[in-house]
Structures are given as structure tokens and as C-alpha cells.
């Protein structure tokens, strides 16, 4: 399964859509698909669907990977209209206006945070021991909130070692953005994954500093 190719193809597609200034970076899509694969994710919650870039990539990936139960929140009228047109498998999204509307008995393998949501605190009810959280981009405020909700969480930044491609909406002189990986209830295997990412990020920063 070539998730990198899927990420590139979806990023190219969404770069031509109205509202593209708010889509996830190409490298963030690669990270999300890799995490989905590595942690054998079957149930996802995306907080802030936007115009649908992330969900479209994941559902495209699911054609090879296997069925994924996808929940998402969005309450912006423009985004809600765009989702219907942009996401190939739109009918597979279980759509909610905000996190507080989701049954607290639901538990998610993967929670993707890609926007602001005043009801973010409700993720405390929706995470369990196997949950992985990814916050797209920098979003330091949201990282701090999530770590406050999960006092034992461990967090590592996932960064790229290449700049934005010229076929996207973001400046090609800037690094392709990644995101923040958080394990709210870190197991031993999660801690190992964390340290591997920590080392990878360190090496990429060294490479960046040489350019």
C-alpha cells in the first residue's frame, strides 16, 4: 500500500479547490496515513473536517487497507457544502456539528484534530488505551489542552525534511508541515514509536539547519 502516493495525489487534487488555503499539508497527510497503517486503525474521529482533504485521503487509502469507520465534526456552512463535492466517499462520513454531540460510549483508535472546537474537552470520553492523537500543523494551544486532558500523555512533533511542492497552495520556500503526535495512554510499543519519531525529528532538524 503506497500511502505516500495517495497523500500526494489527494493533496494535488485539493490544491485546486476553493478553500485550499486551509487544507492539510502534503507531509501531514503522509503522517496520518502512516499512523493509520502502523497502528492498524479501524475507527477515526476527525475534529474539523474542513473541505475534506484528510478524510478523502484516508477513505481512498481504505480501499486497499480495509474498512475504516470515519466520524467527523464540522459546522461551517461553506465547508459542509464543499465536503459533499470534494470527498469521493462522502456517504461514509458520520458527520456531527461538534464533539459534544458524539455518544460518549464511542471509542476511537485515532483522533485527528484539524481545527478549533470549543468542545475539544469531550475527547477525554472518546479515547481509550489504544488511542493515537494527531494534531495537524503546529497548534501549540491545542497540544497544551490535550496534554492537560491526559496528564500521562507523551508528545512528539513530526516534521518533514522537504519544502512545500510547487503544485500546492503553500509557499514553496517553506517546509512542508507535519503535525503533533500524542499518545494519551502510552504503552511500551507506543513509547518505542515515540522515541523513533523523536530521533527522526532530531535528524531532520539537523538536515534543515544545513540548508
Q: What do the PLM-derived regions correspond to, one by one?
A:
Residues 89-96, 110, 128-129, 150-155:
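Active-site regions of enzymes building and remodeling cell-envelope glycoconjugates
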Amino acid at each position: 500500500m503506497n500511502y505516500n502516493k495517495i497523500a500526494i495525489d489527494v493533496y494535488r487534487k485539493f490544491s485546486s479547490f476553493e478553500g485550499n488555503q486551509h487544507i492539510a499539508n502534503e507531509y501531514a497527510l503522509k503522517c496520518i496515513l502512516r499512523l493509520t497503517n502502523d497502528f492498524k486503525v479501524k475507527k477515526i474521529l476527525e475534529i474539523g473536517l474542513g473541505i475534506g482533504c484528510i478524510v478523502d485521503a484516508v477513505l481512498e487509502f481504505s480501499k486497499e487497507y480495509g474498512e475504516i469507520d470515519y466520524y467527523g465534526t464540522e459546522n461551517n456552512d461553506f465547508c459542509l457544502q464543499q465536503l459533499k463535492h470534494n470527498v469521493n466517499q462522502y456517504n461514509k462520513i458520520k458527520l456531527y456539528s461538534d464533539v459534544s454531540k458524539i455518544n460518549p460510549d464511542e471509542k476511537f483508535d485515532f483522533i485527528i484534530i484539524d481545527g478549533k472546537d470549543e468542545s475539544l474537552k469531550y475527547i477525554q470520553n472518546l479515547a481509550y488505551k489504544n488511542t493515537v492523537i494527531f494534531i495537524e500543523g503546529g497548534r501549540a494551544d491545542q497540544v497544551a489542552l490535550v496534554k492537560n486532558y491526559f496528564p500521562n500523555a507523551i508528545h512528539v512533533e513530526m516534521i518533514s525534511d522537504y519544502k512545500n511542492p510547487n503544485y500546492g497552495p503553500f509557499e514553496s520556500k517553506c517546509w512542508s508541515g507535519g503535525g503533533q503526535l500524542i499518545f494519551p495512554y502510552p504503552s511500551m510499543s507506543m513509547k518505542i514509536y515515540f522515541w523513533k519519531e523523536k530521533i527522526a525529528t532530531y535528524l531532520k532538524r539537523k538536515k534543515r539547519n544545513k540548508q
